[in-house]
Amino acid sequence: MRTSQYLLSTQKETPADAEVISHQLMLRAGLVRKLASGLYTWLPTGLRVLNKVAQIVREEMDRAGSLEILMPVVQPADLWQESGRWDEYGPELLRIKDRHYRDFVLGPTHEEVVTALVKNEVSSYKQLPLNVYQVQTKFRDEVRPRFGVMRGREFTMKDAYSFHLSDECLNKTYDDMFAAYCRVFERINLEFRPVIADNGSIGGNASHEFHVLADSGEDDIAFSNASDYAANIEKAEALAPQFSRPAPSAELTKVATPNAKTIEQVSALLNIPAEQSVKTLIVLGEADNKGQQGLIALVLRGDHQLNELKAEKIDGVYAPLTMASEAQIEDTIGCSIGSIGPVGLNIPVIADRSAAVLADFVCGANENDVHYTGANWERDAKEFQEADIRNVQAGDPSPDGQGTLEIKRGIEVGHIFQLGSKYSEALNCGVLDENGKHQVLNMGCYGIGVSRIVAAAIEQNHDKYGIIWPDAIAPFKVAIVPMNMHKSHRIQQVAEDLYAQLKAAGVEVLFDDRKERPGVMFNDMELVGVPHTIVIGERNLDEQKVEYKNRRSGEKQLIDIPQLAEFVSTL
């Protein structure tokens, strides 16, 4: 491809509203252009990368036995009403009406559509298992689109769905798709982790997310330094301490703590470490077994953070987790938020495992500006239930018993689920089994963010000059930069000959034939991230050589022109 016939569209300046490096570089390198909030046009360079990612995904889906289909983006509302998600989904589901005032949605996902399809197309167990996928544009009306294509409203996604008669069959396909996802990210050469995850609004049983490690990631993932264990921090179990609670050695004492509302303030005032205190959070839940609304106390060690997902799965706690208002706390407990503690509370108390082994700890006294020192479980706080309700921390023992946990940020680029019969039951999707009995199907669901992978790859592969593409998804393999070509017939001839040779050999090459200064040409090739650059200059031509530069390593070397085509073929 000649740059004179190409829409290169590079920019020198970094757009002010681009927060993360991938967004900045995708705009500067001419990969995308913003149309509106969360909506982007893919320019030729970006589309070449996007298509390469999609092709790798397609190849691995085909290898895993999945069949490609294409479903409508616009979906009738009645399918979503049948599944129950019409009411469950929030405003991120874009609801529209046609000219006949019938309700439709712009699809964020396709569980309902594919289930309806299989219900009508598959009638016998002999047609199972069935695994289908599509690569398609999705739309989710994000409340705050950000980070460019990483969290846009419109995005390209591969979603696959499998149908089975048994859990065993579903498990096998799930494992096959898990392996296929690993191959996708390995082929692109990304550092990633498959992690145990929560199913969220999709529903179902087993679930794994695939995260590309990057400082700009929105998710914290915990993984062992000695095994393959990895989990989203929301799902990682915080093991109970391997020691018993010490016996009390101090008297319960009230101390004045004026204006000390936070753990940090109380710890500083009383000169104690935060881990020797507890904090008490009040949430809404069932006050008794009659289902009446009341308050529940969640108690954590002072230096630990509440895991809302774990907390809302405890019997009696409302989901989604809802914090009590200041007025509710004042009415029930008689103090403000910063002075609450588990001693003498007349509401259910749930203590995290790490808090439950403390002795002689500091806590709120349920009086404004007053705390207890020397508080102890059973002696002072008599009624409580132990549970895992905190986030794990770096250095915690790994839940699989091997090594300790590290915490890193991750960008979610894939998610697979075992859905079970959630959608097939709702839409009555089943077949006659070998005994002639109607059986509802088990389902699996497997998503990859194709456009998000492009951004995630940049987050892992860049320097101060621009993008450093992994070879598998680079828009071009080789760039030809002829310095001052329009002033030298000799340089032009060598460049044209090399361009023709590489094209004939099937190499994707970007030939910079613009009338630009060499510095501009070099900067653009580095910004765009072409892995290999051939620089043609007068001085080296005197020795029948050209200069080769590797974008990733920065390595430079002189190559004899007669050996150049063979050299490029080895890259």
Curated annotation (Swiss-Prot):
What name has this protein been given in UniProt? Proline--tRNA ligase
An example molecular function term from Gene Ontology annotations: ATP binding
**Predominant location category:** cytoplasm
What catalytic activity is recorded? tRNA(Pro) + L-proline + ATP = L-prolyl-tRNA(Pro) + AMP + diphosphate
Name any GO cellular component annotation: cytosol
Sorted keywords for this record are: Aminoacyl-tRNA synthetase, ATP-binding, Cytoplasm, Ligase, Nucleotide-binding, Protein biosynthesis
For this protein, what is the EC number? 6.1.1.15
Name one matching Pfam family: tRNA_edit
